[in-house]
């Protein structure tokens, strides 16, 4: 973003009555390696040159690295390769996997082939493309195994869908001091129905 704002800017295309420029959705401005000093300098110079207020939309930056999505293996089968069907869905619960593409990290998993057992992880919907990706594990997956996807908070309430009536994931917090998990919201049929009306 800093590079974009420091280039010549075709502001003459904007309405003269506008005094606000909104930028940065999707920029990871909270990452430790993000050049915040440069961004501040560029925004300060931009404001002075164009006499515009600049609003930095934090987007997913406020939740970067936060939250997990805990899933269970529903079925394991083989069709040219080992497959594991999960009780989650790329299309319903993590659409950036299909749109970006975005590859979420799974605890104790690695890229395909890096560990002894590689699986293509699929979602639970009927969509042929509901595929999360290929991951490898130290041991074979079994029905009921839990897989924990990291950095998933930015999906929890914003981009999820109830495609084909798939239930949204429950929202819970974990207290590391006590190990207690508190469920704050469980979604059900009423939530699906109310999205349609």
Where are these regions (language model features)?
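Charged (often Lys/Glu-rich) extended helix/loop segments that serve as interaction or gating elements
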Residues: 42, 53-197
